Amino acid sequence: MALSLFTVGQFIFLFWTISITEANIDPAARAAAAAAASKAAVTAADAAAAAATIAASAASVAAATAADDAAASIATINAASAAAKSIAAAAAMAAKDTAAAAASAAAAAVASAAKALETINVKAAYAAATTANTAAAAAAATATTAAAAAAAKATIDNAAAAKAAAVATAVSDAAATAATAAAVAAATLEAAAAKAAATAVSAAAAAAAAAIAFAAAP
């Protein structure tokens, strides 16, 4: 097609050139130019016919190729559609299997949770009973400790009272002993003082008698 357009363009350019230069040539040259133009027109017509034939052949080949390509495309599309259907079926089967697996896993999880809850409840009850027993034992130990402390306090109080009584008795005995000793000491001192006084009086009388006798002596 491009070749035919180029050939027609050449013919038009040649005809234009001939038309421009026609007034400047002699009749013989004009006749030769006309003959050449006629021949060129025939050649251009032949070229156009050949180009049309080539274009028709190319169009036929292109149409056949397009038909083959379309058939191949349809086959490809059909194959892709079949593959898509197969993939969709596989996906549906996989989804079904996944749903079944999920349901089974959920059921297993529920059963496991129930078992764990039961275990937790049993452990909680055991822990509560153990805690209650421990609390009762602690309360009993506290009561025992309190009773022992009260008994120890009573013993200490009794011992303190006995010690206080013993101290009071000892103080009373010591006071009585001291009073007796003081009375004895006082009596002893009084007797000694009386004896000393008598001795002193006797000595004084003797001295007086001696003095009188000395004074009476010649």
UniProtKB/Swiss-Prot annotation:
Q: In which tissues is it expressed?
A: Detected in blood serum (at protein level). Detected in liver.
Q: Where in or outside the cell is it found?
A: Secreted
Family label:
Belongs to the type-I AFP family.
A cellular component annotation (GO) from this entry:
extracellular region
Q: List the disulfide bonds.
A: none
Q: What else is known?
A: The concentration in blood serum is about 0.2 mg/ml.
- The protein's name is Antifreeze protein Maxi
Q: Any signal peptide, and if so, which residues?
A: 1-23
Domain text: The polypeptide has an alpha-hairpin structure. Two subunits dimerize to form a four-helix, rod-like structure. Each subunit is composed of a cap structure and of tandem 11 residue repeats with the sequence [TI]-X-X-X-A-X-X-X-A-X-X. Each repeat forms three helical turns with an average of 3.7 residues per turn, as opposed to 3.6 residues per turn for a classical alpha helix.
Q: Which UniProt keywords apply?
A: Antifreeze protein, Repeat, Secreted, Signal
Record function comment: Contributes to protect fish blood from freezing at subzero sea water temperatures. Lowers the blood freezing point by about 1.1 degrees at a concentration of 0.1 mg/ml, and by about 1.5 degrees at a concentration of 0.2 mg/ml. Binds to nascent ice crystals and prevents further growth.
Describe the subunit structure: Homodimer.
InterPro entries named among the record's database cross-references: AFP_Alpha-Hairpin_sf, Antifreeze_1
